């Protein structure tokens, strides 16, 4: 079975601080049964804050999903103990025995008729047959989903669900072997970091940001600047004269081409800064925070929440159309309103900007949402 990339986990774990439990729910892996290799389950670092929770590449993990061959079986009064091997390691799985309905209802005092006795007997025989055919022995393939725990200083899985895998031609095992490397690449080997520290890390690592990272950081700083100065409109050139923003946009950036890192030289700093400003403003436009009535980087930008003229025009469009028979009952759909804005105002307005204006008008009780993406004004 293919091996996961364990080097990243081994190198990153010692230097990374444990993420506070408050943020664990932000990682989808925390609530899922993580499909991990047994070797990784055995090597995961246990949380110091919440025993019973483990970390792989920063991902908090409580429950796992494994599939492998049974190499040992121990039967106890209330549970089975299976040693499961997936070709990367062996782990013990505690699987509780299923309660038999026949045993719980076979009390002669409860069974009053011969017919009930006969049905109970037949049911018991059926259950015995099923148990015989599904009995798990050495060499069988088993799938186990459960929580990871420590018992006598050894890590094991306490099963919530377990069953014998009927896979004579290896279809399920091959599918699993193909699935796990993709999960590792897309999910488990992508480190989960403390959201509270991400912005701080970005600020501390400005010199190592690529163009996309620097653009995202600059867009946040522009947003803060516009809010602080309470600006209603601006030109890109105005922002370029702000020393703090210009200093950030002029930082050296790296571009990844495969494994090569090519740093832009100082001779191109001015052009790169303009490009970063343009991309940052484009990002704010995509979020609906700013807009242009006419497209072009040299055109005036408007702050969406500060543009009273835009709010009034959209309000009047909704109010007028709601008086028409086809919109009187349900109101106007968001896309219909956007189309009216493009036709009547000839403004290059995006859906994201319109959504922010509609939310603002609704907060002010100027319009109401009558259904999903439908709005009415009175």
Curated annotation (Swiss-Prot):
Gene giving rise to this polypeptide: Stn1
SS bond list: none
Segments of the chain annotated as binding DNA: 64-165
Gene Ontology CC: chromosome, telomeric region; CST complex; fibrillar center; intermediate filament cytoskeleton; nucleoplasm; nucleus
Region (Winged helix-turn-helix (wHTH) 2): 306-378
Region (Interaction with CTC1): 8-195
Taxonomic lineage: Eukaryota, Metazoa, Chordata, Craniata, Vertebrata
Species this chain originates from: Mus musculus (Mouse)
Effect of residue 151 to A: Impairs single-stranded DNA binding
Renumbered residue ranges of the record's region Winged helix-turn-helix (wHTH) 1: 201-305
Official protein name in the record: CST complex subunit STN1
Top-rank lineage group of the source organism: Eukaryota
GO biological processes: negative regulation of telomere maintenance via telomerase; positive regulation of DNA replication; telomere capping; telomere maintenance via telomere lengthening
GO MF terms held by the record: single-stranded DNA binding; single-stranded telomeric DNA binding; telomeric DNA binding
């Amino acid at each position: 079975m293919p091996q996961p990339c364990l080097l990243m986990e081994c190198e990153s774990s010692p230097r990374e601080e444990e993420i506070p439990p408050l943020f664990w729910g932000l990682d989808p892996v925390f609530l899922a049964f993580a499909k991990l290799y047994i070797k990784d389950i055995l090597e995961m670092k246990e949380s110091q804050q919440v025993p019973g929770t483990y970390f792989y590449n920063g991902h908090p993990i409580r429950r796992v999903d494994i599939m492998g061959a049974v190499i040992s079986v121990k039967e106890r009064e209330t549970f089975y103990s299976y040693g499961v091997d997936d070709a990367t390691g062996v782990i013990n799985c505690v699987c509780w025995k299923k309660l038999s309905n026949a045993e719980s209802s076979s009390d002669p005092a409860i069974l009053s008729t011969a017919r009930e006795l006969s049905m109970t007997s037949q049911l018991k025989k059926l259950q015995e047959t099923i148990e015989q055919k599904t009995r798990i022995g050495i060499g069988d393939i088993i799938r186990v989903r459960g929580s990871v725990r420590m018992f006598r200083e050894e890590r094991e899985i306490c099963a919530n669900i377990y069953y014998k895998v009927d896979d004579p031609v290896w279809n399920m095992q091959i599918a699993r072997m193909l699935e796990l490397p993709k999960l590792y690449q897309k999910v488990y080997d992508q480190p989960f970091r403390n959201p509270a520290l991400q912005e701080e890390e970005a600020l501390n690592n400005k010199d190592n940001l690529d163009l996309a990272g620097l653009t995202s950081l600059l867009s946040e700083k522009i947003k803060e600047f516009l809010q602080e100065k309470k600006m209603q409109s601006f030109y890109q050139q105005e922002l370029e004269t702000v020393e703090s923003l210009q200093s950030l946009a002029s930082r050296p950036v790296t571009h990844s081409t495969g494994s090569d890192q090519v740093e832009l030289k100082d001779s191109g700093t001015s052009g790169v800064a303009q490009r970063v400003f343009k991309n940052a403003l484009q990002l704010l436009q995509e979020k609906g925070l700013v807009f242009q009535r006419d497209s072009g980087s040299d055109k005036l930008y408007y702050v969406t929440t500060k543009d009273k003229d835009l709010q009034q025009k959209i309000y009047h469009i909704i109010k007028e159309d709601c008086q028409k028979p086809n919109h009187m009952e349900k109101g106007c759909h968001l896309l219909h309103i956007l189309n009216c804005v493009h036709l009547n105002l000839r403004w290059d307005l995006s859906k994201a900007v319109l959504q922010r204006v509609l939310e603002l008008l609704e907060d002010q009780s100027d319009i109401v949402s009558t259904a999903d993406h439908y709005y009415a004004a009175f």
